[in-house]
UniProtKB/Swiss-Prot annotation:
Coiled-coil spans in chain: none
Designated name of the protein: Protein translocase subunit SecA
Gene that produces this protein: secA
Cystine crosslinks: none
Alphabetic keyword roster: ATP-binding, Chloroplast, Membrane, Nucleotide-binding, Plastid, Protein transport, Thylakoid, Translocase, Translocation, Transport
InterPro entries the UniProt entry points to: Helicase_ATP-bd, P-loop_NTPase, SecA, SecA_CS, SecA_DEAD, SecA_motor_DEAD, SecA_preprotein_X-link_dom, SecA_SF2_C
Amino acid sequence: MLNVLFGDPNERRINPYKQIVNKINYLEAKLKKLTDSELQEQTERFIKLLSNNSSNEELLPEIYATVREASLRVLGLRHFDVQLIGGLILNDGKIAEMKTGEGKTLVALLPTYLNALAGFGVHVVTVNDYLARRDSEWVGQVHKFLGLTVGLIQEGMSQFERRENYLKDVTYATNSELGFDYLRDNMAIDLEDIVQRPFYFCVIDEVDSILIDEARTPLIISGPGNSPVNKYIKANVISQDLIKDIDYEIDEKARNVILTDNGILKCENLLGNTDIFNLQDPWAPYIFNAIKAKELFLENIHYIIRNQEIVIVDEFTGRIMSGRRWSDGLHQAIEAKESVPIQSETQTLASITYQNFFLLYPKLSGMTGTAKTEETELDRIYGLEVNCVPTHKIMQRVDFPDLIYKTQYSKWKSIADECLDMHNLGRPVLIGTTSVEKSELLSSLLKEYGVPHNLLNAKPENVQREAEIVAQAGRLGAVTIATNMAGRGTDILLGGNTSYMARTALIDLLHVNDASTISTDIATNVDFLKLKTFIQTKLDIETFINDPQCNLKLGLACEKSFTNDEQIITLRAVYQVLIEYYEKLLSPEKLRVQSLGGLHVIGTERHESRRIDNQLRGRAGRQGDPGSSRFFLSLDDNLLRIFNGDKIAKIMDQLQIDEDLPIESKLLNSSLESAQKKVEAYYYDARKQLFDYDEVLNYQRQAIYFERRKILETNNLRSWILQYAETTIEQYIEDYFSKEANNLEACLANIEFLLGLNNFFDVIYCSTLNRNDLKQFIIQQLYIAYDLKESQIDLIETGLMRELERSFLLQKIDSSWKEHLQQITILRESIGWRGYGQKDPLIEYKNEAFNLFVNMVSKIRQSVVYLVFRSQPILKN
């Protein structure tokens, strides 16, 4: 009704952009007349105009028109009007919701080029290394064509490589690499160790995945800590003796466990009448984690075991998270459960949440196919407005109502039946599962049915073929099982992805990869053999495949960017022949798949978040293609079991519905959506609470990191140490004069101890001085003592005092910050109990965290001054 009266609010937000798009379109004919070199000269012209105070808004239509023309010449892809709208939304620091297949990667070119002209560096963030490399090599060619430099950050890169790539105009990286580099930079002991520039503008691809799904997991750099391995083993043994619903209760919504009185007594008896809550030797955290490991964290669902290690599986993407560990002893508890080596518990050296990390960017924007359901959170926490970009073609996908079965058996049997029917029909099917275990269960069923299929989950043997499997999931009769959204970022094209097949064939012709996926085609097809002969006459293949630039050149060969490189020109000619071959080969197949109804997506369980369900559905019906989706559910599914599953079961029993027959009802769909909204609200509250608490630490983090950076950037830190000493001395004197039972002798003794002096001050003389005169007198002595200490140390080696100052400052800041993080963690874990005393835990946390921080800063000052004045370097012979 409101939409009828006032119009669609999203449409109102989009309308102003349409006027700018008209201006961009008007400039298209003019730019088409420019030669390549004239088009490339536009960049230098824009930079000069911007440096002469021309505004981005004035130049924006021409800048976007230039990028569109460059994209057409380099990639053969021209931005549609809706893609221009997406680019305008991003430039305004908002989130552009664009459906799957609408060309988000191409859209990001527009704002990244415009903002890179300022010279401060732009970051394009993706969810994995593969997508970062793909985008930098593909659309990065447009930036290079226009004269900008393109960088890429990948796992395993050296410090030098990282610094060089961050200096580029546009840098592609994953969210985790960016975050960890930021933390490492703020642990650096030399300016040369810092790799990042100050942040400027950032575009996040799959922004909902990074800012919502990963917001609960902070980035942590850890060091070795003390962990009693025997406690994890003993707690695991005890947990096996405890009985669910008698000794402990499970809160599945909160993913938490609660020990009953009976359970506490049982644990204490098993431990020899030990109080499990004893603060000096606590057992409770170990037992709680052991029960969580037993009940809430399951192999092939939440983790896999690889090389005797527990590897986390991302519950949202189905990908393995190498190098990541659960904190607070949970990972060790799972290691004890699975009888694999228990790694030492670590101590946090530096940490930050993605929420606070991305808020460091003065200008932030993002793209995704699914953000509307989370727009409240994105606005409240990040200040990011969500705008929905219209699709280029009308969406044709049909989303069928869910089918709900009484048992898991009935559900999986029906899914397998549907896969068989679709396969026999020739229609491609994509089945999304929620875990490794369930993907393998369905795979076993399909094998029994004789249905050929591809399996993609977190297991290493499947991950290696990820892009290939997803790219070919639209082939005639293809059946693909994928865990959640593994493979996200690679489009499923009806009839098959010809460009992917052509590139794979080119790689096979060069023998770049040992394992060929289409080697039979190549071996038996005369045209392919002719192409191989052609390559051999033009290239030294062995030299080429050993060239470090091999992959980059292959990427360039598969694009349309200008090049003088003879090797790339040769490979591009072969690639074009392969493209034409596969397009001709697959064109009838594409038409056939379209006529059958396109890709059919099957969901095997409703996720806790509607977004994840929408992402799965969004694989079908891209760019106006036909498609459909359907979810098959069971009353045993987690979401239904936790929320209202028993009520639906009663209805099915009352109606005497057979186990093999499903319920299909819009009312039930609404009930499920309501359950999902409850879960989403719960997790939003958890993320908001995390943000509120981490914001307190964030202010402290920024203060410490600012101080550290200034220390690294300052050549002479003498004034720094003296300022620390003055502040400490002034505090001692203030304390002396403010106390009723003042003790001047004790005050002077503290100052003498701080400065490494023995019986230096005359108490009788000092007692005759007023507050200000006493300060001036002691600070005067401080400067004399410091000059003497500097002369003494510089006798050993000229300039040694400066090195000691920096070393002591960084050493004490880092060690104190590490201890502070530990204290903050303990405070955070215990503060919740204040709520039972009618106190607001957050306010209590803020007050106590502030006091801890003030004490830490005071301790740093005192310790640094003490170390400098007590240092006694030894003269070398």
